[in-house]
Every structure is written in structure tokens, then in C-alpha cells.
A protein has these predicted regions:
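N-terminal binding-site loop/beta-alpha segment at the start of enzyme catalytic domains
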Residues: 1-76
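Structural motif corresponding to the early beta-alpha repeats
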Residues: 71-101
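Beta/alpha (TIM)-barrel catalytic core signal, keyed to glycine-rich beta->alpha loops juxtaposed to Asp/Glu
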Residues: 57, 129-322
Length: 322
């Protein structure tokens, strides 16, 4: 495992971290298997774990806390997230701060997460949704400053809305935000335009999430793919989006080098960018851990391949242009 500096915090974090969205009772997860996967990740050098209260209403945090207690003495960095008070995803400018992140709510859910994790301090507390319409509101600013001063959190980050990579820049300019978590993968390259350069220039850590585009870049997506009732991928991969995704995968697959599979290529693409501090694939089984962590070996992609992957950028979202 290789490590990178996590922005201004100075932490040395594993460049492949652990995304825990799939744990805590979501998408058919199994607690025993999840714990085995977490154990295996620690054994292989993973030390950055990203969870949230919303992942099973504390269940994912509980599993992580249980794992950390079983590995006392191991350096591990814990990142979690505060849900918006109105429990609406994504964040929108029309929502007021009192409806999303009033000070008492920020404190309440920080204390809840500390309880589920069994910790006295959270390394990285993040806003789970965001709109830059809230950036200059001093209520959330004072709240996070108080949490830092009291030692309840060490640093503060923002999880950026999907396909809205610039909808955080005003918040970053306050100087209060230590990290951003953003969707960044072979298809979703928009963060390279403004966000990643800004973070690199200002020593702000970058957590690249959704490295496999919700599963399309695992190489297992087909026209017949189905998911359990209630799994949000049924909405994400609706008929039109599924068809478009499969078409793009057909064009991408010839670029996968011999001896490498698509998931490994997807991770290596992300790690090519120097602004990225860590990427957080979801890993519910030990086999997932072993498959993903192999990409952290310092081997660079050939420049010609990197250039070819750039052509697979897919601008998506409400304001996207082809």
C-alpha cells in the first residue's frame, strides 16, 4: 500500500481507502462478511475509512468502531458525515441553513456518530450534502469551529453533490474546509476543470468517491442487470442511462491492458491525478478488498493510455453539455 498526504492535515493516508456506503444493512450487506473485509483491509495497509450516520442510521459506524477496537494500536483515520436536518439528498440552494445544518443539528449528529464509533474524536467530519448558497452563513462556520476547539473533530470536509463539482468552491474559500469528497472516475472527469486544481493549489485534501460509477466500471454491468427492490441503482441505471452506459463501456473495453481488468484500470486512472489524496471504493467482501488494493503499487499508466482514457469523459447532470 502506498500513502499520500491528506491536504493540510499532514496525515499519511492509504491512497485506496475504504468506502462503507454498502454496509450497515444496505444492498443486502452481511455484517459478518463486512467485518472480515474490514479486517483484511487493515491487514493490507488500508488506513482511511469513510462512513456516515446515514449508512444504516449508525450501523456502518458501529461496524467500523467494532473493527477499530479489535485493532488497537493501528493507525486509522475515520471520516464520517452529518446528514442534512431535512434528510433530503442532494443539497439545494433553495433549502435554508436552518433546514439543513443548523448548529444544534451539527452538534447532535457529531455526538451520535462519536457514540456509534466509540470514539472521543472524529478525524474528519463531513457535511453529507452541500450547496454553496450556504457558504457564507456564519452559523455552520461557528459550529464546526466549536467542535474543533472542543476536540470533538480534528478536521472538516464537504461531500459534493454528484455532477456539481464547482458547487463547493465558495465554501473552500472560507478556509474552514480541509477536504472535499467528489465523484471522480473515468466517466466523471469534470472535477479536473476547476475543483482539483484549486484543491491542489490550496492544500485541500481530495477524496475521490464512486470510482466504479456505481458498478458500471466493475465490468459486470449488462443489459440484463437487475437489483433488489429499493436499491437505488434501479433508478440510476434506468433504461436510457443503462443503454448509454453500456454503449460507452463497449468503447472503453478495448483500452483495458492485458493482465489488467476494468476495475483496476478505473482505480489507476484516479490515482494518476496528483490532487487525489485517496479514493474510496466500496468493499463488502475480503475478495473485493484484495482485488482493489492491488492497484496501489505505484505503477503509472502509460501516457498514451492516460490520454486515451481522457476521451471517455462523460458530462452528465442537469447542466451538462455533450
Amino acid at each position: 500500500m502506498r500513502y499520500r498526504t491528506f491536504g493540510r492535515t499532514g496525515w499519511q493516508v492509504s491512497e485506496i481507502g475504504y468506502g462503507m456506503w454498502g454496509m450497515g444493512g444496505w444492498t443486502g450487506s452481511d455484517d459478518e462478511e463486512s467485518l472480515k473485509a474490514l479486517d483484511r483491509a487493515i491487514a493490507l495497509g488500508c488506513n482511511f475509512f469513510d462512513t456516515a450516520w446515514a449508512y444504516g442510521q449508525g450501523r456502518s459506524e458501529t461496524l467500523l468502531g467494532q473493527t477499530l477496537r479489535a485493532h488497537k494500536g493501528v493507525t486509522a483515520y475515520v471520516a464520517t458525515k452529518i446528514p442534512p436536518k431535512n434528510m433530503k439528498w442532494p443539497g439545494k440552494a433553495e433549502y435554508l441553513v436552518e433546514d439543513t445544518y443548523p448548529p444544534d443539528h451539527i452538534r447532535e449528529f457529531t455526538e451520535k456518530s462519536l457514540g456509534f464509533l466509540g470514539l472521543q474524536t472524529i478525524d474528519l467530519q463531513q457535511f453529507h450534502v452541500w450547496s454553496d448558497a450556504w457558504a457564507d452563513d456564519d452559523r455552520w462556520q461557528r459550529a464546526v469551529d466549536d467542535l474543533k476547539r472542543e476536540g470533538l473533530v480534528r478536521s472538516v470536509g464537504i461531500s459534493v453533490n454528484r455532477w456539481e463539482a464547482t458547487n463547493v468552491l465558495r465554501a473552500l474559500k472560507t478556509g474552514l474546509i480541509d477536504s472535499v469528497q467528489v465523484v471522480y472516475n473515468i466517466f466523471d472527469q469534470a472535477p479536473e476543470d476547476e475543483l482539483l486544481p484549486y484543491c491542489q493549489a490550496n492544500n485541500i485534501a481530495v477524496i475521490a468517491r464512486v470510482p466504479f460509477d456505481e458498478g458500471s466500471l466493475t465490468g459486470t454491468l449488462t443489459a440484463d442487470s437487475t437489483w433488489p427492490d429499493g436499491d437505488w441503482r434501479n433508478l440510476y441505471f434506468n433504461r436510457d442511462h443503462l443503454t448509454a452506459t453500456l454503449t460507452r463501456l463497449d468503447r472503453l473495453s478495448p483500452l483495458v491492458p492485458e493482465g489488467m481488468d476494468l476495475p483496476e484500470l478505473a482505480l489507476r486512472f484516479i490515482l494518476e491525478h496528483p490532487a487525489v489524496s485517496t479514493t474510496i471504493p466500496g468493499m463488502r467482501r475480503p475478495a473485493h478488498v484484495e482485488r482493489n488494493l492491488v492497484a496501489s503499487d505505484g505503477i503509472r499508466l502509460p501516457p498514451r493510455l492516460g490520454d486515451a482514457l481522457k476521451t471517455h469523459r462523460w458530462n452528465r447532470g442537469p447542466n451538462a453539455t455533450p
